[in-house]
């Protein structure tokens, strides 16, 4: 029995949708009668195990770092120092996600390490799974849905674990763990419930209201042509007089003890920098962390964008704002990456033709960039990740997020090649065959799906996010579109990619052999956006995550607008629902129409139109179809989410302390990794 199948007996299940557990939570002390299948995958032809285990709705994967041995000792040392810097800030992400997270992590890890009793019981397995889910999400809220993870063991069993280990927990902490009404949701996106008041994210003190936060940000809005990203690196609190003020993330300020370590390792990295531009950007980042000055963050981003010559690159900072219901504050993340020269060369034609793509977009002329500058795109191999990028990671990134910097100085886009490969190697079989409409759809996917996915990611990051412009006088999107800004931007980039996936220009450029690659991507996108991604939701839940919402509203809008012409047909055969794209060219036309409207929404800051589009097509779920998807998926035993164990690095030094080389190995124990991180990189107090 696979671990996911076993979970159907012990848990509410993989992505949910299975029946409630047959084994009652009241038998936490009963010994499990069936051997536990951890869900590890079979070794590949070289003996490497890509998937190490599966629990709840998660599979744990390993990735390799191709080309590591080709790096010079200096480049290896640079990677090592940048990775140490990233890991040194990991506690920040935990505390940002929720103010109780570090206390709960310490408590759970203490039990896990100190308990000497019977570990063959249902209760212990439930506790272990809960801890792993918390580790995976960097806190007590699901990493994707943002809903609080509810333990499947009873409070009585937890009291037993506390007694057996000599540990204690306050009633406040127990309520946070067990009461569904306490800290229920990390990010609330329903404005009627109070975006700030109902969000458990730790970007706002508990007594700060949505109205107060918005008023404060409006009072400090930067209306210059080069605005800083206000609120990016701070928590909003009330001072003794009751006025709103910021607690900046900086050395000597909030999260200072962890940022001191980050700064130390960034300083170490400078001595191994590949070129002066890289060293300058690193020094800018250090100065920013020391002061919290957002003007220095701008300077860092400008110099980071200009640093395109090295083999090693990185992302480090308070970057993406998806976790802020108001879209201002960035989550801490770190990715250290090595350029894949061969794969990058194949995609250089996208960069070279960026202006052609911009000029050909079906958007209003006033929303097109007249001159596209500084787009850099590389396929990279990740060497290490931390914070918001780990264990669950993106597969593509486009930065910086500042609109004016992108227009004036350009942007960097990367596809995380070895992460995509690891997902593919660990991917379970059966979903395509179960949900594809017919044999031809399966054939297209098997023949072209891999390339289609990579091209979509490249177009999304390189052309999509870098495209378009705001109308004069329109504020940054987070201020105009507010809680809808993230999903609108992700959907806009998807629509750019989808529109061009069926363009003969890609065949002409040699990026794909035929338009069958585009057809495979259209099939996949509609299948996922309208059906398959629903396996990630618990029955009765709304769609919450920005990317899931955008896939839904893009797909559902096109389905509705093309329904009369039969562009996409929904059929039921033998009680199963299937989606069939009948007219790919017409669907491309619909993607183009929607792209024009979405670009207009962004360029003009049309909040009402954004709300109507997202709420109308991207939030609610057909319960009958949802249950069907859950039932069909459950039989396959494939976890809907994946995340990673990072490689471990050991540095060797000469007598002077200079790093002379770094060895890389690939651990296969997720729990071991997380405990090691807590031991070696716990640089914050548990309350901040």
Where does each model-flagged region fall?
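Long, well-structured alpha-helical subdomains associated
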Residues: 93, 498-601
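Extended, compositionally biased alpha-helical segments that mediate assembly or anchoring
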Residues: 215, 583-688
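Contiguous, non-catalytic segments that form substrate-binding/exosite surfaces or channel walls
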Residues: 126-238, 242-442, 449
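Post-HEXXH active-site segment of zinc metalloproteases
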Residues: 468-491
């Amino acid at each position: 029995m696979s671990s996911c199948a076993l979970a159907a007996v012990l848990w509410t299940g993989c992505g949910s949708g299975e029946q409630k557990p047959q084994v009652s939570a009241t038998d936490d002390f009963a010994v499990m009668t069936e051997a536990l299948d951890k869900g590890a995958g079979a070794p590949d032809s070289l003996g490497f195990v890509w998937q190490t285990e599966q629990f709840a709705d998660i599979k744990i994967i390993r990735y390799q770092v191709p080309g590591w041995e080709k790096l010079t000792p200096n480049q290896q040392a640079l990677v090592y120092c940048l990775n140490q810097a990233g890991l040194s800030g990991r506690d920040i992400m935990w505390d940002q996600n929720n103010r109780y997270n570090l206390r709960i992590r310490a408590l759970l890890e203490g039990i896990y390490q100190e308990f000497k009793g019977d570990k063959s019981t249902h209760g212990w397995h439930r506790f272990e799974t809960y801890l792993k889910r918390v580790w995976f999400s960097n806190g007590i809220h699901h990493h994707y849905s943002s809903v609080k993870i509810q333990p499947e063991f009873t409070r009585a069993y937890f009291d037993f674990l506390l007694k057996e280990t000599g540990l204690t927990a306050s009633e406040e902490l127990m309520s946070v763990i067990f009461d569904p009404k306490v800290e229920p949701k990390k990010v609330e996106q329903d404005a009627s419930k109070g975006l700030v008041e109902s969000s458990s994210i730790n970007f706002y003190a508990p007594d700060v209201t949505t109205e107060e936060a918005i008023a404060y940000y409006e009072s400090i809005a930067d209306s210059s042509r080069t605005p800083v990203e206000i609120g990016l690196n701070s928590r909003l609190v009330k001072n003794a007089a009751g006025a709103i003020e910021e607690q900046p993330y900086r050395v000597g300020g909030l999260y200072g003890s962890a940022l001191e370590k980050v700064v130390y390792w960034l300083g170490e990295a400078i001595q191994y920098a590949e070129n002066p531009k890289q060293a300058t950007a690193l020094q800018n980042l250090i100065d920013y962390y020391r002061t919290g000055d957002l003007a220095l963050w701008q300077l860092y981003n400008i110099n980071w964008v200009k640093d395109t010559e090295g083999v090693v690159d990185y992302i480090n900072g308070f970057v993406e704002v998806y976790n802020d219901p108001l879209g201002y504050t960035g989550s801490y993340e770190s990715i250290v990456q090595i350029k894949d020269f061969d794969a990058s060369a194949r995609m250089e034609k996208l960069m070279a033709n960026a202006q052609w793509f911009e000029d050909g977009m079906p958007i209003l002329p006033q929303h097109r960039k007249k001159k596209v500058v500084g787009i850099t795109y590389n396929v990279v191999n990740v060497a290490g990740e931390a914070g918001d990028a780990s264990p669950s990671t993106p597969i593509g990134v486009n930065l910086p997020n500042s609109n004016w910097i992108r227009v004036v100085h350009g942007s960097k886009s990367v596809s995380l090649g070895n992460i995509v490969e690891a997902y593919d190697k660990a991917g379970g079989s059966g979903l395509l065959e179960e949900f594809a409409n017919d044999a031809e759809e399966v054939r297209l996917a098997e023949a072209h799906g891999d390339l289609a996915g990579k091209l979509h990611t490249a177009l999304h990051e390189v052309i999509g996010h870098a495209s378009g412009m705001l109308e004069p006088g329109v504020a940054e999107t987070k201020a105009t579109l507010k809680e809808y800004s993230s999903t609108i931007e992700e959907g806009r980039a998807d629509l750019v990619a989808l529109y061009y996936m069926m363009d003969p220009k890609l065949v002409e450029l040699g990026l794909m052999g035929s338009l069958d690659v585009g057809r495979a991507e259209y099939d996949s996108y509609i299948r996922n956006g309208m059906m398959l991604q629903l396996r990630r939701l618990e029955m009765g839940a709304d769609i919450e995550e920005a990317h899931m919402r955008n896939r839904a509203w893009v797909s559902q809008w096109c389905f509705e607008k093309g329904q009369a012409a039969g562009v996409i047909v929904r059929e039921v055969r033998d009680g199963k629902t299937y989606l069939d794209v009948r007219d790919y060219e017409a669907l491309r036309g619909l993607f183009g129409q929607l792209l024009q409207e979405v670009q207009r929404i962004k360029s003009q800051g049309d909040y009402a139109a954004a709300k109507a589009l997202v709420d109308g097509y991207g939030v609610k779920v057909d319960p009958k179809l949802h249950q069907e998807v859950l039932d069909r998926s459950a039989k396959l035993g494939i976890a809907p989410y994946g995340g990673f164990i990072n490689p471990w690095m050991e540095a060797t030094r000469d007598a002077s302390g200079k790093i002379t080389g770094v060895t890389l190995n690939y651990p296969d124990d997720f729990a071991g990794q997380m405990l090691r991180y807590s031991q070696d990189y716990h640089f914050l107090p548990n309350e901040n």
